Amino acid sequence: MERAIFAGGCFWCMVQPFEEQAGILSVRSGYTGGHLPNPSYEQVCAKTTGHTEAVEIIFDPKQIAYKDLVELYWTQTDPTDAFGQFEDRGDNYRPVIYYTTERQKEIAEQSKANLQASGRFDQPIVTTIEPAEPFYLAEDYHQGFYKKNPKRYAQSSAIRHQFLEENWS
């Protein structure tokens, strides 16, 4: 099994697209990239810990390749917005691909270069590619949020879905 970590704005919106793929064993919401061990949601939202909201994906590389996860990641984000994603603003919502191996880094960098060269976006691709740091699980009420709170999830992801429809369909 392998591990992938992606930050793409609110972690609530990043779970379902990955969870629906064959070969995915788990998708968990959490925090990474900061300087405070085991931060709380409130601390991360206060923008004082340096963490981003992210998802940790455990996957079977025999069933789904890391490259495919990176390609799916792009289609869930606005890779031209370094200061958050959609209605969620700030460093804790910035788009990041965290790599856990040098091979993941190479795949992510090549994929980013391909996306930039594709001309899909007029603006530069600003999603960063960074080494994975400790991943801290978010509180239980954040796990599987889209299943537990479908109406609130739909409301919180409306702007994201409009952008994805307009730019990735």
UniProtKB/Swiss-Prot annotation:
It is an enzyme of class 1 (oxidoreductase). Its EC number is 1.8.4.11. Pfam families: PMSR. SUPFAM superfamilies: Peptide methionine sulfoxide reductase. The active site is at 10. GO terms for biological process: protein modification process. It catalyses: L-methionyl-[protein] + [thioredoxin]-disulfide + H2O = L-methionyl-(S)-S-oxide-[protein] + [thioredoxin]-dithiol; [thioredoxin]-disulfide + L-methionine + H2O = L-methionine (S)-S-oxide + [thioredoxin]-dithiol. Transmembrane segments: none annotated. Keywords: Oxidoreductase. One of its GO terms (molecular function) is L-methionine:thioredoxin-disulfide S-oxidoreductase activity. InterPro entries: Met_Sox_Rdtase_MsrA_dom, Met_Sox_Rdtase_MsrA_sf. Belongs to the MsrA Met sulfoxide reductase family. Has an important function as a repair enzyme for proteins that have been inactivated by oxidation. Catalyzes the reversible oxidation-reduction of methionine sulfoxide in proteins to methionine. This is Peptide methionine sulfoxide reductase MsrA.
